[in-house]
């Protein structure tokens, strides 16, 4: 028996996103006439028929998705939430509602936010699982209730989640190790900071960094990583202690967005000039440190793309009943002083997401229509 054609088949045949296929099939805005004609032609040739789930979603008066993330100390999580909003607008539907639930610290309010998502009868959940073990029971409960969960930025293995969208952590850690080893001539002491080793993404970066440093620059010493739990004061205090204890430190890898407290600690202890620093993500204060030469490079994790794709994966799962790719991994972007201005020109205005989505945290976004994006695949965008 011939397998039933899906949105994924049409998208693959045309080399476009499933969101574009959906908009074309439902005559929603944001798709050119030529693309719509191609989609209709290919869907007919493949024998595509909308399934009951797709029809259900099109007719629902209130399609609700809960977005559970950290508030964040920089623009990273604002960018993720902004990308999720863009993903919703891209479908051109007016009945998609996003309930944003944020928590201030790792694990602080995370379970309560998940419970609130289930109590509000969300159709699906996008989640940053900062404490996967404590969430395992909640996520199993969501699976039993047929509420799909997509993890964003980091994974929660063995929890029943349907997919994860994240940056390539192994590539990030390995790249940082190779560059710092080269900057230091393959000699000296290196250190790294992270939020918590219990977070899958952070642990993977550290493992990749340590392994690559040992393999490519065996004469370099790697210290015990510093856990700051995403608390700026803790990052500052612990790094001041690190610099006082190891005045010979040469290389520093900051694996998270919490780079400014670390840089300030280095500046206040007189260590900044002797350190080669690779940071993570990009925001105005960090851009200033790059321009000043205080930070050699930063590894950009493409948060807006992570958000867009997380929404698309969850929506596709609700429509098709499966995740075409349960592990979506994005390649990181390396930003240095030489390409910083070019990179910023290609990025959304850094402050825009802060003003657009900050008010949506612990709130609701709904509707699309006039704000639908063009019919390019979101994965083709520079972010």
Task: Enumerate the predicted regions with their spans.
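Hydrophobic alpha-helical
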Residues: 125-143, 209, 227-286
């Amino acid at each position: 028996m011939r397998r039933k054609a899906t949105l994924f088949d049409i998208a693959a045949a045309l080399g476009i996103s499933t969101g574009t296929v959906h908009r074309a099939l439902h005559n929603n805005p944001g798709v050119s006439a030529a693309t719509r004609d191609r989609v209709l032609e290919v869907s007919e040739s493949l024998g595509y028929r909308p399934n009951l789930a797709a029809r259900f979603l099109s007719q629902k008066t209130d399609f609700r998705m809960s977005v559970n993330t950290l508030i964040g100390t920089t623009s990273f999580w604002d960018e993720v939430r902004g990308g999720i909003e863009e993903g919703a607008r891209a479908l051109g539907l007016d009945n998609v509602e996003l309930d944003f639930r944020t928590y201030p610290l790792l694990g602080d309010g995370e379970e309560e936010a998940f419970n609130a998502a289930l109590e509000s009868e969300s159709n699906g959940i996008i989640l940053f699982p900062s404490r996967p073990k404590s969430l395992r029971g909640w996520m199993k409960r969501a699976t039993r209730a047929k509420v799909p969960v997509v993890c964003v930025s980091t994974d929660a293995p063995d929890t029943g989640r349907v997919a994860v969208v994240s940056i390539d952590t192994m590539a990030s850690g390995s790249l940082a190790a190779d560059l710092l080893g080269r900057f230091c001539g393959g000699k000296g002491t290196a250190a790294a900071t992270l939020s918590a080793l219990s977070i899958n993404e952070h642990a993977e970066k550290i493992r990749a960094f340590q392994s690559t440093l040992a393999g490519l620059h065996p004469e370099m010493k790697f210290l015990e990583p510093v856990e700051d739990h995403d608390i700026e004061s803790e990052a500052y205090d612990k790094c001041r202690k690190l610099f006082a204890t190891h005045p010979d430190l040469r290389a520093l890898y900051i694996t998270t967005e919490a780079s400014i407290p670390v840089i300030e600690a280095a500046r206040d202890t007189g260590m900044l000039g002797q350190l080669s620093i690779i940071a993570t993500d990009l925001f105005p204060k960090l851009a200033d440190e790059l321009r000043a030469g205080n930070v050699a490079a930063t590894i950009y994790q493409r948060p807006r793309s992570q958000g867009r794709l997380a929404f698309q994966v969850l929506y596709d799962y609700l429509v098709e009943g499966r995740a075409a790719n349960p592990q979506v991994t994005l390649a990181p972007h390396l930003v240095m002083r030489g390409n910083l201005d070019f990179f910023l020109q290609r990025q959304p205005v850094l402050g825009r997401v802060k003003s657009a989505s900050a008010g949506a945290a612990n709130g609701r976004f709904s509707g699309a229509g006039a704000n639908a994006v063009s019919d390019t695949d979101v994965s083709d965008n520079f972010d």
